[in-house]
């Protein structure tokens, strides 16, 4: 699945609360080359998987790879022409790289944490560390939150970097109000925007606004949404 970070964008970097939910309108899965609708796109995806595999092999070689992955099987599939067939738009913040990392862990992981079983906080923190390392290949640095949502397919409430857990969100109601996605038509890269935010955080005035104003209203939005209070 894809994901949507409803509340906490950038704020979670500064320990504001965050609420992220899976978004099943978009999804992705590994497919053999024979099932490709677009041969050129499949070839490009296959090449990207090969580059990612090389990165994972390098981490394994220096002993720093956190997840236990069957990289030999991954390599065999790549050599057979496998690609990641995804409807998730890239560069729109809905978890395209996160879904890929989750799919790799799900397909090639050994002794994985089963998302169908009861997931406790320790399991979530472990998964977050695994996915954070994997997705860092794409963004330079990753919290691991996006692939975590994609893998668990459950809403996650983030209190801090190490305090997070699954949560139940209110059932959809009836009326005129709704949360919706608006396609800006302007894809962008995550890392440059994070860099801009971190640069702004060096400013004392900006840090004060984030701490005293943004975090307060952001956390209030999360609490109200979970209670179903949308007025």
What are these regions (language model features)?
Residues 1, 5-7, 11-13, 20-21, ...:
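C-terminal nucleotide
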Residues 15, 22, 100-102:
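Residue-level recognition of conserved structural "scaffold" positions that shape functional pockets
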Residues 87-99:
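Gly/Ser-rich catalytic serine loop of serine hydrolases
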Residues 99-111:
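Stable alpha-helical structural segments in soluble proteins, enriched in small hydrophobic residues
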């Amino acid at each position: 699945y894809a994901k949507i970070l409803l509340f906490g964008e950038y704020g979670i970097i500064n320990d504001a609360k965050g609420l992220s939910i899976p978004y099943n309108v978009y999804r992705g899965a590994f497919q053999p080359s024979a099932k490709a609708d677009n041969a050129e796109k499949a070839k490009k995806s296959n090449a990207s998987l090969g580059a990612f595999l090389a990165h994972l092999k390098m981490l394994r070689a220096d002993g720093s790879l956190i997840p236990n992955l069957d990289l030999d099987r991954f390599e065999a599939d790549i050599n057979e022409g496998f690609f990641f067939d995804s409807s998730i738009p890239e560069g729109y913040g809905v978890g395209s790289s996160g879904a890929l990392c989750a799919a790799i862990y799900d397909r090639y992981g050994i002794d994985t944490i089963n998302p169908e079983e009861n997931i406790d906080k320790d399991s979530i923190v472990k998964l977050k560390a695994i996915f954070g390392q994997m997705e860092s290949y794409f963004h330079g640095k990753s919290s691991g939150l996006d692939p975590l949502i994609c893998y668990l397919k459950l809403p996650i409430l983030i209190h801090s970097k190490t305090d997070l857990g699954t949560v139940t969100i209110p059932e959809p109601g009836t009326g005129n109000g709704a949360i919706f996605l608006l396609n800006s038509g302007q894809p962008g890269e995550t890392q440059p925007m994070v860099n801009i935010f971190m640069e702004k955080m060096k400013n004392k005035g900006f840090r004060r606004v984030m701490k005293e104003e943004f975090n307060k209203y952001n956390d209030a939005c999360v609490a109200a949404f979970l209670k179903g209070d949308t007025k």
